[in-house]
Regions:
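Short His-centered aromatic/hydrophobic patch
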Residues: 85-91, 110
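Nucleotide-activated donor-binding/catalytic signature segment of Leloir-type glycosyltransferases, i.e.
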Residues: 228-251
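Acidic anion/phosphate-binding donor-loop and adjacent secondary structure
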Residues: 63, 146-147, 160-178
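Short hydrophobic beta-strand element within catalytic cores of glycosyltransferases
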Residues: 288-291, 301
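Conserved donor-binding/catalytic core segment of Leloir-type glycosyltransferases
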Residues: 4, 174-192, 197-201, 213-214
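Conserved acidic donor-binding segment of nucleotide-sugar-dependent glycosyltransferases
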Residues: 303-304, 308-315, 324-330
Length: 370
């Protein structure tokens, strides 16, 4: 069985992390797998090389206007049995190639939760008619697809993200530091609610100062004006509120596993998510979680067991839940961490993830997944 994985690039994104992992796991299972991209960001490329996964940036496809033609030529020449595409544009490109001469079977993967049904979204789901499977990485997106496009219900199969349970692990029982470290791992974008989180920290600091926040997510290479402007606004807020000694914004890092081990809590204040990689990693690292009550988060974070949920639009609610978390006794803090790890082991293992993909790849034509 020959499988081609298609994605835009291998920069430091969640979808890229999952596709790199999928490629390596399929290779370990003996699948003839290769990966194509059309931009040359290489954050995860070393991982592919170490596993012996062939990787190629399709020359010419970086051009918006020529992308389809170069990708079509490449995919037709490769003659794969399957193409697995992640993210909207690669999924659209693979669907078009499949319509226009492609003999391969196709899995398209939805990596976020759709907020608005635009014309582009409707076109994308129309093109999915010929896909063998639609694989959302969250149950909330799976529900969305089945509700708005019921004709796709039979071939929609949710496969949540996996986490490396060996890499993301805390070898010893957690003992909370003073001040406590609240870790956030997310891009500094409007959808991640950085400004709202800073406002919540300002409220919390009015009556306690026994914590610091380490937010890893600054993109020093960003050329997108709105993202750069948003990050600058966040820095101004921190200075205006006098939080320079409390909230620290750091660049993205490949050594994030060590940061999880050094933290006491994990927080994710996003307005929406799919199944966040960083939530999986934090839970595998035995951290209590404080996150927004959106999408799939309540499927993994249970109040009174391993974390706290808040309304991301309500700054006071966010501050209150951060406060509750900081008030946990040492015994409860450690217990929440153990519970997070147990949930990760049950629901987020590499084996569960790759087995679900293999059940699709091995399914007979017009057959349903196991």
């Amino acid at each position: 069985m020959k499988v081609v994985l298609l994605i835009d690039h291998f920069g430091a994104g969640g979808a890229q992390r999952q596709m790199a992992g999928l490629a390596c796991l399929l290779k370990e299972r003996g699948v003839d797998v290769s990966v194509y991209t059309y931009f040359s960001y290489n954050f995860y490329v070393e991982q592919l090389k170490q596993s012996g996964v062939p990787y190629e940036v399709v020359k010419g496809a970086e051009s918006h206007w020529r992308r389809f033609f170069y990708l079509r030529k490449k995919l037709l020449a490769a003659q794969p049995d399957w193409v697995v595409a992640y993210l909207d544009t690669p999924c659209i490109m693979a669907s078009l190639v499949n319509w226009l001469g492609g003999k391969f079977r196709l899995i398209v993967s939805e990596r976020n939760t759709t907020q608005t049904l635009t014309r582009r979204e409707r076109l994308k789901f129309w093109l999915y008619r010929n896909a063998d499977y639609i694989v959302p990485n969250s149950y909330s997106q799976g529900d969305f697809v089945c509700k708005h496009f019921p004709q796709h219900k039979a071939k929609t199969v949710v496969i949540p993200n996996f986490v490396d349970l060996d890499k993301f692990a805390c070898a010893t029982e957690r003992h909370r530091q003073q001040p406590a470290v609240i870790l956030v791992v997310a891009s500094i974008w409007a959808s991640k609610n950085t400004k709202g989180f800073i406002d919540a920290v300002r409220l919390l600091r009015q009556h306690r100062n026994d914590f610091v926040v380490k937010w890893f997510g600054r993109d020093l290479r960003s050329t997108i004006p709105k993202n750069t402007a948003y990050a600058q606004e966040c820095q101004r807020k921190i200075k205006e509120y006098g939080l320079e000694d409390t909230v620290f914004l750091y660049p993205k890092t490949k050594q994030i596993a060590e940061e999880y081990r050094k933290a006491d809590y994990f927080c994710l204040p996003s307005f929406y998510e799919g199944t966040p990689n960083v939530l999986c990693e934090a839970m595998a690292s035995s951290l209590p979680v404080i996150c927004s009550r959106v999408c799939d988060n309540p499927k993994y974070v249970f109040e009174g067991e391993n974390g706290f949920l808040f309304d991301p639009y309500d700054v006071k609610d966010m501050a209150a839940k951060l406060d509750e978390a900081l008030q946990l006794s040492e015994a409860l803090h450690a217990g929440y961490g153990r519970c997070s790890r147990a949930i990760a082991e049950e629901k987020m293992s590499e084996q569960v993830f790759v087995d679900r993909y293999l059940s699709l790849l091995r399914a007979p034509h017009d057959g349903q997944a196991e």
